[in-house]
Design a protein with these regions (language model features):
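Extracytoplasmic
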Residues: 1-107, 766-965
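Signature aromatic-anchored transmembrane alpha helix within multi-pass, membrane-resident enzymes
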Residues: 483-493, 560-562, 608-617, 711-771
């Protein structure tokens, strides 16, 4: 049994014993004797135990009798799979093999994610079931969420659903990863009930002990349901209008996501098998799909329907989590009428983060000289900066790719909400500390294994928030909080150690960017948020900077920035270079931003150290204008945000911190990028910009919206009521403003609010015109009625290849339905590997979850070693074109293929560069020649035929051969 633990070393031996036990080598089992330890009638499988215990104490004995004599060629054919596995003659594998160690067909799977046939056949009922499942997950952990957000007026009602999903999902995953229990529907149900019992049992104990947990009111819970339910209904309606899982040019990566989601939903152990690299494990950030699969298992709605519902659920939960963040922060503001401010802040934040787009929509309308009826390019707005991706949450929602970066958006917002609550109301009792930091560890770990790009932001936020909260409390309780924050980061790694221990990252080192973003394109992406922040700063500068010292501070800071830029420009010219016009524009903009911030925040009156640091920072920012003009703007806003944050109360500092973090994120990618498989080309920083811009949109959107709401709330307050200057600290001072001063301040602030609101409303141009443009991109065969059937377009769906031949998909759809209904276990299929996007390649494995020899090679290169991918790509093409029957069958045996797909994609797909069809006519005819001699026709419909590789004959054990006691 020990050789099973080293498949890289004993692949052939393992395959031999596996075939022997299956009766495929001509030997019949005539006797099997073993003793299984037991207690109270329960048997314990001790096979994984050390051999010194099993072999020498109670060996497992098998006796085989030779019945059939196989030739050397027949034995060779049976052991082809083992002989083709990567072999390393060492005790330890030199690298992570990323392989299962057994054929994919023998991995344990379950098809219990579609147990609810009644709901699957009734879409309205299925929607209700899904909604109830999300609510159930939230209610299960309501006492835990209420403890974590005990100081927030919502008492965790806005975060409970995410917390419940994360808790249940992790418990299912960790058990399946450590082989404690399988990932199945029954286990998900038991864990959900257990979590609810523990949470509510704890609630009862706390109540009896005189320390009750204050739960959210029914009204607040229903309000949360209404918020996320409304968002869910809106985004689900978009999916019902445009349900297609694939489209020739604008289909996205849904086939990839569906394949992996199906494989995860079918896997009972983790890591799951790779559906696009048979015999391999998924070496990708699959955990977000596991969370979706958890709800799919719980509801029994199946992956196809679950995918559509999840695509609507994620942005809806993001909206709810944004409301949770704004409620947590704004409820701590000191104001006379808190409720209107909370509502305005929540609505503004939701719109700014989840609904609006960037300024490219306005640019398109201006270029069209009027409101467009047709021709609006919704895609262009996400590719503003050349060779990068500049997506934002609304595009992500209507694009409807269930990708890791999408799934992780509400997780990031949950971390920000938890940290905000930690800072504003630091926990002091031990139980609350444990709850808060346990949830932070869970959320951080989830972010790391869902979309690792988000982990640094989440970890840094937790650490900084813990230090800040600890400093506010002081003493031993403060130290406990700081230690808790550090422990949460380590706990996150330990909680997900099974994932990291088997994961191999193809992402390389941090590299320096050759060039930054053009200033104009950069401002198109971020101009809305920058303008909102700028009007807030200018309002303060106008009101507070009217003092002589305010304008003097502004002059000093602005001159420092200009001095740094001028020196850098001169140095560039001396070295023979040129200074682009954008650098001058960026320098003067930065000087203006810094001057206004200095007048409003008055950092130069906070002591000598702050003054020196501020001046040096202003000089440094100006100095980089010559070669990174975009970074200059972002860093200027970051500096101003820092000035405000260090001298205001935590509740008012948090929006500035969000803005500052967002600006640092987008400034950082102007200097460095993470090396990946795109390194060395024009697109080398594509993923870095893409991922960090996603985070920055959340931070800047929420931060700027909160600043605007706060500005509105101050329209009736004292001019200086928002800044806690050191000179007035710890003094009980009541200031009565002059009526004229108060009126002037109110006018300035309200005018600034109008400008900021107009900026945000401008962003609504994108959803107004981009939504209809996106919905118009469905396949011509897509149903003209509302449906969530993502494969309905295949019924009558066709495309043209490069030479004008028609590729039909009717037969493929029937083959998919047949395989889903009749394929048992986890058989390997063979279909054309034609790369991503255009030709609907790998459509059968995507729609069934069955492992194929090779799916989209481009995505596999992001996950595993290239040599195996190249070999498989060549082998798959060879199988479809080879006319030698023995070699054709040998290749199928080598990859343990059970079903061979021959449809129009295999028959006709080609490209302009290579007009020859993917499979030659002679190669396809050879499959027919093998029928009856290694193949059978298992299914046929239209132009699609499914061949089944004839399995090897098996000898069943002799009657009465097995003896177990």
């Amino acid at each position: 049994d020990s050789i099973d633990n080293e498949p890289w070393r004993y692949a052939v031996q393992i395959d031999y014993y596996r075939r022997l036990a299956a009766g495929e080598l001509g030997f019949q089992l005539v006797y099997e004797g073993k003793v299984e330890p037991g207690l109270f009638g329960l048997r314990l499988n001790d096979r994984p135990a050390d051999e010194s215990f099993t072999v020498y104490d109670h060996p497992h004995v098998r006796i085989y009798k030779k019945v059939d004599s196989l030739s050397a060629a027949e034995i060779h054919e049976r052991l082809l799979w083992g002989a083709s596995q990567p072999w390393y003659p060492m005790r330890n594998a030199p690298n992570k093999t990323l392989m299962l160690g057994v054929p994919a067909s023998e991995t344990p799977t379950s098809n219990d994610a579609n147990w609810n046939s009644v709901a699957i056949s009734n879409t309205p009922f299925a929607i209700v079931v899904w909604l109830l499942a999300i609510e159930l997950l939230g209610l299960a952990v309501a006492p835990i969420a209420a403890t974590a957000f005990r100081a927030s007026p919502d008492r965790g009602a806005f975060s409970a659903r995410m917390i419940g999903l994360l808790m249940v999902g992790w418990l299912v995953w960790i058990g399946a990863s450590l082989n404690w229990w399988p990932a199945r529907t029954l286990v998900v149900s038991i864990i959900t009930i257990t979590v609810a019992a523990c949470a509510w049992g704890w609630y009862v104990l706390r109540k009896r002990s005189g320390r009750p947990i204050e739960l959210p009111s029914v009204r607040v819970w229903l309000a949360a349901l209404g918020i996320w339910g409304t968002g869910f209904a809106f985004f689900l309606m978009l999916r019902a209008i445009y349900p297609d899982f694939w489209q020739t040019w604008f289909g996205g990566e849904k086939p990839f996501e569906l394949a992996y989601l199906r494989a995860i939903a079918r896997s009972t152990e983790f890591p799951p098998y790779d559906p696009w690299y048979s015999g391999g494990i998924i070496n990708y950030y699959y955990y977000g799909w596991h969370l979706v699969a958890t709800v799919t298992r719980l509801t029994g709605l199946g992956v196809s329907l679950g995918f559509q519902l999840a695509v609507a659920t994620i942005p809806a939960l993001l909206i709810l989590q944004i409301v949770g963040l704004t409620t947590t922060i704004t409820s701590s503001w000191r104001q006379r009428r808190p409720r209107p401010t909370v509502i305005i802040a929540a609505v503004t934040s939701v719109v700014a983060v989840s609904i609006i787009g960037n300024l490219d929509a306005l640019a398109q309308i201006i270029s069209m000289r009027g409101l467009p009826r047709t021709g609006f390019d919704f895609w262009r707005s996400t590719r503003v900066i050349d060779f990068t991706i500049n997506e934002f949450p609304y595009f992500t929602a209507i694009w409807a790719d269930l990708h890791p970066h999408m799934i992780d958006l509400p997780v990031i917002m949950l971390v920000l909400t938890l940290v905000s609550g930690l800072v504003l109301a630091p926990p002091r009792d031990r139980q609350t500390v444990i709850v808060v930091f346990s949830l932070l560890a869970l959320a951080l770990g989830t972010a790391a294994v869902t979309n690792s790009w988000d982990a640094p932001l989440c970890a840094g936020t937790i650490l900084a928030g813990g230090i800040w909260a600890g400093a506010r409390v002081g003493g031993r309780p403060g130290i406990t909080i700081i230690v808790g924050a550090i422990a949460a980061i380590f706990a996150a790694w330990i909680m997900f150690l099974p994932f990291f221990s088997g994961f191999y990252s193809v992402v390389g080192d941090i590299s320096r960017t050759a060039t930054g973003s053009p200033l104009g394109e950069f401002l198109v992406v971020w101009g809305i948020f920058f303008l909102v922040v700028l009007v807030v700063v200018i309002a303060d500068a106008v009101i507070l900077g009217r003092r002589r010292t305010g304008w003097r501070d502004a002059l000093v800071a602005g001159i420092a920035c200009l001095a740094g830029g001028t020196a850098a420009f001169a140095f560039a010219v001396v070295r023979g270079g040129t200074v682009p016009l954008s650098a001058f524009v960026a320098l003067w903009l930065a000087a203006g931003i810094i001057s206004a911030g200095s007048a409003g925040a008055a950092p130069l009156r906070l002591g000598r150290v702050i003054t020196i640091v501020s001046v040096v920072a202003a000089i440094g920012i100006g100095a980089i204008a010559s070669h990174r003009p975009a970074a200059v703007i972002a860093l200027s806003f970051a500096l101003v945000a820092a000035w405000y944050a260090i001298q205001t109360r935590p509740a008012r500092a948090l929006p500035w911190i969000l803005v500052g973090l967002g600006c640092l994120a987008i400034a950082g990618v102007e200097f460095v990028f993470i090396s990946d498989d795109l390194s060395g080309g024009d697109w080398q920083r594509m993923n870095t910009v893409f991922k960090f811009y996603n985070q920055a949109w959340l931070l800047l959107g929420a931060g700027s919206a909160l600043l605007l709401a706060h500005l509105w709330s101050r329209s009736r307050t004292l001019p200086a009521g928002d800044i806690d200057h050191r000179s007035a600290a710890n003094k009980d001072i009541t200031l009565v403003p002059h009526p004229r001063t108060a009126m002037r301040s109110a006018v300035v602030r309200r005018s600034a609010c109008v400008v900021g609101a107009v900026a945000i409303v401008t962003g609504l141009l994108y959803p107004t015109f981009g939504t209809t443009a996106r919905l118009a991109q469905d396949m011509p065969s897509s149903p003209q009625f509302l449906t969530l059937d993502g494969y309905a377009w295949m019924n009558g769906g066709t495309i043209q290849n490069a030479t004008g031949d028609t590729i039909e998909f009717d037969g493929d759809l029937k083959a998919i339905e047949w395989l889903n209904a009749n394929a048992r276990g986890n058989p390997v299929i063979l279909e054309a590997s034609i790369g991503p996007y255009r030709g609907n390649g790998s459509r059968i494995s995507s729609a069934t979850g069955l492992p194929t020899v090779l799916g989209w090679d481009r995505h596999q290169r992001q996950q595993r070693y290239p040599a195996g991918i190249d070999r498989r790509m060549s082998d798959v093409h060879t199988v479809y074109n080879d006319t030698s029957l023995p070699s054709k069958l040998e290749m199928l045996r080598r990859y343990d293929v059970r079903y061979v797909i021959v449809g129009d994609v295999e028959r006709y797909w080609n490209s302009a560069d290579n007009p020859a069809p993917y499979a030659s006519a002679a190669g396809l005819d050879a499959f027919n020649a093998l029928v009856g001699n290694g193949l059978t026709v298992a299914f046929e419909s239209g132009h699609t035929r499914v061949y089944e590789v004839t399995p090897f004959a098996r000898l069943a054990p002799a009657p009465g051969a097995v003896h177990i006691r």
